[in-house]
Amino acid sequence: MLPTIGWEDGEVVMVDQRKLPSREVYVRCRTAREVAKAIRTMVIRGAPAIGVAAAMGIALELRRSTASGTTQLAKEFYRACDLLAETRPTAVNLFWAIQRMKRVFADAMRAGRSTDELKSAMESEARGVHDEDVANCRALGRHGAAVVPTEANVLTHCNAGALATGAPLRLDHPTSRSVPEPDALRAQRPTRG
């Protein structure tokens, strides 16, 4: 299975879902602005994947910050949050992830953490958002595999499946019972261009 999104060499790397299935292309993001563009232009799709991207974009922006104090770092943090919040107003997980990052940032600020500690806390939280999403997807796959017959015709609506992450239909995840290709028709109806 293609990885949807991850960290590589200090960058956020995501599969360009607009190019699938004909080509496997990866987009590398070095700033929150680049992550925001990837979300806005639908390089990455599916609300949970968008939430993961937002958390990683925030952490990425702080990682590259040269702020000498926590006040300046906080300004950069909230600017990155606002930038990412403007990308997809219907993606619930986007706002959930941003609020989660804000809560952790505020707690770390109240605890008197240094700029380096704040940066580390944000990256750790973004990794946590990602890891929890992967675990949730695996659980959805296990539960779905138990109720969907092996020989089933499945029509999904919007972005369901491995690349959307967290979607209600994840039966073809490698950690769950696979739905054999000849036995199941997987079709998707996009909800927007």
Name each model-derived stretch:
Residues 43-193:
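N-terminal active-site beta-alpha-beta segment that forms phosphate/nucleotide-binding
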Residues 1-33, 37-40:
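Positively charged, low-complexity intrinsically disordered leader regions
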